[in-house]
Amino acid sequence: HYIMKTYHVFIASSLSFQKERDLMEKVLTERNNSELNIVVHRHEKNGDNDLAKGDTQEIINSEIRQCDVIIFFAGNWIRSKTIGEFNVAIENASNKHIYFYQNPTLEYTQEDWTNTTLWKDFYAEYMQKHLDDDTVIERYEKQCNTLEQLRDALVKDRESFLNNPFCAISCHKMEY
C-alpha cells in the first residue's frame, strides 16, 4: 500500500499580503492528489486583533512547530509578532524549510515594525549562532524578492525533501 505524504505549510505575514497568501495557498493545494496532501495553515491577523476568535499567539506558535515548511512575507518593515513567529520556526528548525519573501515596495509606518534590512542582519547572525551545520544554514537562507523566485526556490529545493512534492509547482506561472 502506498502511504500518502502530508506536508504542513505555514504562511506568516500581515494582512497586506492577502493576495500573495491566497496565491501561494492556491499554488500549493493545487498539487494535492492521491499521493500528496499539502495542508496550508494561515491566520488572518490585523495588528493585535485576530479576526479568527481564539487564535492566540501560542496557538499559532504551536502550529508553526508542527509545520514542515514556513513561508514569511515581508515588506520594507516587519512586525514584531512575525519576528516572534520566525524565532519559533528557527528554534524548531531541524526538520523545517524556511523561505523568506520580500516585497520591497510595501512600506509601513506603524511603530511596532522593524526595518527589514536590520531584521535580515539579525536573521543571518541568528542562523550562524543557532545552526552550526553549514549545509543547514545554506538551506534556510533563501530570500526571494519576487513570487517567481519563491516558486523557483520551492521547486529547486529538491534534495532537502525526499521526493520533494514542490517540484510539481514548476508547471504553474505565478501571476500577481
At which residue positions do the language-model features occur?
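Structural alpha-beta junctions
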Residues: 29-37, 92-97, 128-138
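Conserved N-terminal substructure of TIR/SEFIR domains
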Residues: 2-70, 91-92, 162-176
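Conserved TIR/SEFIR loop-to-helix hotspot centered on a Trp-containing motif
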Residues: 51-52, 76-95, 107
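A short acidic (Asp/Glu
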Residues: 21-23, 82-84, 109-112, 176
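Short beta-alpha junction loops
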Residues: 44-46, 77-78, 94, 98-112
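A general structural detector for well-ordered alpha-helical segments in enzyme core domains, enriched
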Residues: 24, 59, 85, 118-122
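C-terminal interaction surface of TIR/SEFIR-family domains
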Residues: 106-176
